Regions:
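Acidic, turn/loop-rich segments in luminal/extracellular domains of secretory-pathway
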Residues: 2-169
Length: 169
């Protein structure tokens, strides 16, 4: 079996030896149409870079032959997941909160790579609000008074440690 990082086409080589004759390499089987092999060297590649979030395993059969004999072996290529997707907000960009209470709501996000997300806020009213960096729960630092201010604006950033995205709230 082989392992290959997503978003890259290189897989590795099938290796065979014959003392007297040159060898020819071929692929067949379930996912052979997604792979290529150099018929003289056995070097394999994906025809297009794989995406872990679409398909994680490819199966094929490698056949090596000379002018008289052949051997074949089934193999798999396991696609290695990389942190290549930014988080995405799935909650509304607008929250309504009751006067004289600190609760606002929770920002909801998803990450196609399954990474743990952290949250932060910035912007005009960031000093009036807080966000739990692990859960995305938004709160007022002190209960708001409707007669004093009716609207607050912040930018929430969700990060998976490598990629981040923002939403204005």
């Amino acid at each position: 079996s082989f392992s290959s990082n997503e978003n890259q086409t290189s897989i590795g080589s099938i290796v065979a030896t014959d003392d007297s004759e040159s060898l020819i390499y071929e692929l067949s089987g379930t996912d052979a149409s997604s792979l290529s092999i150099n018929n003289a060297t056995g070097e394999m590649t994906f025809n297009s870079a794989p995406d872990y979030e679409t398909k994680t395993t490819y199966s094929a059969i490698a056949r090596v032959y000379d002018e008289e004999f052949f051997t074949q072996k089934a193999f798999q290529v396991f696609v290695v997941n990389l942190n290549d997707n930014s988080p995405a907000f799935t909650s509304s960009a607008t929250f309504s909160a009751a006067e004289n209470q600190t609760a606002i709501g929770t920002v909801a996000t998803s990450d196609a790579d399954g990474e743990t997300l952290s949250y932060s806020i910035s912007g005009t009213d960031a000093s009036s609000l807080s966000i739990n960096s692990s859960t995305g729960v938004l709160t007022f630092n002190s209960a708001p008074d409707y007669e004093a201010k009716t609207s607050y604006a912040v930018t929430v950033t969700a990060s998976d440690g490598t990629n981040s995205t923002t939403q204005s709230i």
